[in-house]
Amino acid sequence: MCRRAACREAEAEARASPGEMAAGGLSRLERKAAERVRRLREEQQRERLRQVSRILRKAVAERSAEEGRLLAESEDLVTELQGRSRRREGLKRRQEEVCDDPEELRRKVRELASAVRNAKHLVVYTGAGISTAASIPDYRGPNGVWTLLQKGRSISAADLSEAEPTLTHMSITCLHEQKLVQHVVSQNCDGLHLRSGLPRTAMSELHGNMYIEVCTACTPNREYVRVFDVTERTALHRHQTGRTCHKCGAQLRDTIVHFGERGTLGQPLNWEAATQAASRADTILCLGSSLKPPSLVCVCVCVVCLSIRPFPQVLKKYPHLWCMTKPPSRRPKLYIVNLQWTPKDDWAALKLHGKCDDVMRLLMDELGLEIPRYSRWQDPIFSLATPLRAGEEGSHSRKSLCRSREEPGPGDRGAPLSSAPVLGGWFGRGCTKRTKRKKVT
């Protein structure tokens, strides 16, 4: 009775407003009826899609005659579902980690070594994969930041002050000393390139450095290198560290470029040098990056990519680093070394599947170079660091670096260290912005 009354009321309303019918062509009641029909058809289509999907998951021999007829009547749905299945399988295969057998890897490394020797201007591009050996998680690996977030799990990391430059970091520094590498373009914020002894003029840390804070009120900007993670209180779009400039008293800020932000600082980002290196390079050795947009991906030229696991997607694009305006004959060759698929595989002259440290060890052996060992006593961060002023000791709670592991760091005051995981201010910040949180009931 209620529905009939509603219909009569709708008809009366439609008759009372002929202007509306003339203007729109349909009465309000007719539009509502058409909308109900549309929704009903959509629900029927979804239910049919679910039925077809359940049938396709069965073995052919297990399908009934009625189910066979339903599939025959739903060719479009079958084609769509089979296409979805192929795409899912393709994505799974791309996420799988594949290793070349030892003999094949050595053969490929010999070819890579030849490319390094013959390069006129070699630029190294690095991502999170080169730091996994230092117990710093990557982003897309099995235990990476993005992977854990997608599973709804929390992100944690070991105390980053315990991280030290890896074999790959030290190999890059050696290659630069031997004038085989001209510049390093890095997406990493962990400061391990700086601590490996690589000159600051020879690197561009495009996403910042966790050990550096700056005063943007001073001209030029005044840098403060610290022996602790300065990002404890910072986050996406919130960069003040809580300390002040020794000269002008303005608030200091970190140098981290989070996902969705655009880096504007001169140093340590050093974009000018990165762009110049990209335009001059004929070879790029890329370690630890997925080369997936919208990450920094490769810098315009030959990319020799040694990547264990992919890196975060912090900024959307770096088109001016690609130099794709050059004719194909002038573009550099592409060499990729990665355990996983990358979107640049088809462009590569050679694809190697291997871990960064493993490949770099073989490469340095092939080049006849000895890999220097990292020493905290020779870590340049201690000579570059600006000590905290009196009264600033309590401005952070992160463990400070020290030359000896037994020596208490500056500002630690001998306080006992917590065994709980420590999460750096920059690590994972901005990643959680787009994750869905489960409602607590």
Task: Please name every model-derived segment.
Residues 2-441:
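Conserved catalytic core of sirtuin-type NAD+-dependent deacylases
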